């Protein structure tokens, strides 16, 4: 699950679609974080806190293909047709054996959009963060080829960026996911370099937005690069699907 964690404040999701887009809203448990989702030709989201824009409309999507047929494309998040919307509130906790606390509270409001094409998109609004994930309802296995995850900001904010600096044998996706942080405006991010997560953006009023992943099963998979058009945001980059697997 992709997450945008905000320190000391809440978030709002807004998905700006196109003509005839369907719109849905979600609020955090304390009411300070509101989420608005527009689903149309594209699926985008926007986040705000207490009158402050945190994230401008940013596209999310997933591209794949049938496991046995390379010509059969599978796309989530394009030309979205929502069949129904489901909502629920959760107040629970989960154990954290390697953390300073024995358990952590898990309190959020959730919106799940069931979409035509065999998938759902799930949004969560926490008091201190927001997240989304795609859920496949395909009856056959498929291969994920790429994912769209944009994070667009309204200004050229200062950011703390953990660049990849250990390209083993020239392979930019082979990395230990450990790095020092460079501090610079978003517009000054290197266009030819990948960043790992978490990446922190310093917003107005002393607020901080942290982009990261959650719910990972094996290893971090999302890298980030500067948006070459706006220079005021970042885009996700993922290691390509391997054509051949060898034991290294």
Task: Locate the predicted segments by residue.
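N-terminal accessory beta-strand-rich subdomains and adjacent acidic, glycine-rich linkers
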Residues: 25-248
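Bacterial Sec-dependent N-terminal signal peptides
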Residues: 1-23
């Amino acid at each position: 699950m992709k997450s945008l964690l905000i320190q000391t404040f809440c978030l709002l999701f807004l998905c700006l679609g196109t003509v005839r887009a369907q719109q849905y809203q979600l609020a955090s448990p304390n009411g300070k974080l509101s989420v608005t989702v527009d689903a149309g030709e594209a699926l985008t989201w926007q986040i705000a806190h207490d009158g402050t824009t945190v994230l401008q409309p940013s596209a999310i999507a997933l591209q794949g293909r049938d496991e046995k047929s390379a010509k059969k494309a599978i796309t989530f998040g394009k030309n979205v047709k929502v069949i129904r919307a489901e909502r629920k509130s959760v107040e629970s906790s989960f154990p954290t054996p390697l953390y300073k606390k024995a358990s952590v509270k898990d309190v959020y409001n959730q919106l799940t959009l069931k979409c035509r094409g065999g998938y759902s998109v799930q949004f969560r609004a926490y008091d201190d963060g927001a997240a989304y994930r795609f859920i496949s309802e395909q009856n056959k296995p498929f291969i994920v080829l790429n994912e769209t995850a944009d994070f667009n900001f309204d200004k050229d904010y200062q950011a703390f960026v953990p660049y990849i600096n250990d390209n083993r044998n020239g392979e930019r996706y082979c990395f230990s996911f450990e790095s020092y942080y460079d501090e610079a405006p978003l517009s000054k991010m290197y266009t030819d370099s990948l960043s790992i997560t978490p990446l922190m953006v310093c917003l107005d009023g002393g607020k901080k937005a942290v982009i990261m992943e959650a719910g990972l099963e094996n290893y971090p998979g999302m890298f980030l690069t500067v948006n070459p058009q706006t220079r005021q945001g970042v885009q996700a980059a993922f290691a390509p699907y391997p054509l051949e697997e060898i034991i290294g």
